[in-house]
Amino acid sequence: MSVHIGAEKGQIAETVLLPGDPLRAKYIADTYLENVECYNEVRGMYGFTGTYKGKRVSVQGTGMGVPSISIYVNELIRSYDVKNLIRVGSCGAIRKDVNVRDVILAMTSSTDSQINRVAFGSIDFAPCADFGLLKAAYDAASERNIPVTAGNVFTADQFYNDDSQIEKLAKHGVLAVEMETTALYTLAAKFGRKALSILTVSDHVITGEETTAEERQTTFNDMILLALDTAL
């Protein structure tokens, strides 16, 4: 066991899907996995292991924000030797050519978080996705005829934030805003693991269009299928 994950050694697969919402973790396990075992309920942050098309896969909720996902990614890697980490989360679009419910493959992540300033000082470390996972997800999207956009996202430290920088980010090609990817990619790089964020646009910062909480929990199925196919 680790501090925040109650699993025994061997209960967690080498590949783990990482939804922020623990109820999305339960939805994924109930809907897509077979032979499911719940290995974690600590703090209500559910974790499950099962099989998808014969491949052993785990799903672990992470909570919201850089500090929370950092706890779970650290423990999954250091205590359970997880090799592949695939975030399945929501994001807010900041460009007019990106629509609500679109799927984004995050190639890299800019941020206003201090996580990398603390680690690297004045150096601007640019964390990126694992190319093998990125390519696998892109190929899976092509096979399933699921449109995807690959590019830069922005990991914000605040959910309710000043929008003054949004226009500048959009002009520089940033597709959407979320709260975890920089931490995931930085920790994967630190420990020599593979990571990818697959995101569904849940709301649009510019137009104001948004999905409901229930939709965010249970209907982002294209993203989930791509993540599971990538796990194979």
UniProtKB/Swiss-Prot annotation:
It catalyses: a purine D-ribonucleoside + phosphate = a purine nucleobase + alpha-D-ribose 1-phosphate; a purine 2'-deoxy-D-ribonucleoside + phosphate = a purine nucleobase + 2-deoxy-alpha-D-ribose 1-phosphate. Keywords: Glycosyltransferase, Transferase. GO terms for biological process: purine nucleoside catabolic process. Phosphate binds at residues 20, 24, 43, 87-90. The active site is at residue 203. It holds the Pfam family PNP_UDP_1. The record marks 216 as: Important for catalytic activity. One of its GO terms (cellular component) is cytosol. Transmembrane segments: none annotated. A purine D-ribonucleoside binds at residues 4, 178-180, 202-203. Signal peptide: none annotated. GO terms for molecular function: purine-nucleoside phosphorylase activity. Catalyzes the reversible phosphorolytic breakdown of the N-glycosidic bond in the beta-(deoxy)ribonucleoside molecules, with the formation of the corresponding free purine bases and pentose-1-phosphate. Belongs to the PNP/UDP phosphorylase family. NCBIfam families: deoD, PRK05819.1, PRK13374.1. Homohexamer; trimer of homodimers. This is Purine nucleoside phosphorylase DeoD-type. It comes from Bacillus licheniformis (strain ATCC 14580 / DSM 13 / JCM 2505 / CCUG 7422 / NBRC 12200 / NCIMB 9375 / NCTC 10341 / NRRL NRS-1264 / Gibson 46). The lineage of its organism: Bacteria, Bacillati, Bacillota, Bacilli, Bacillales.
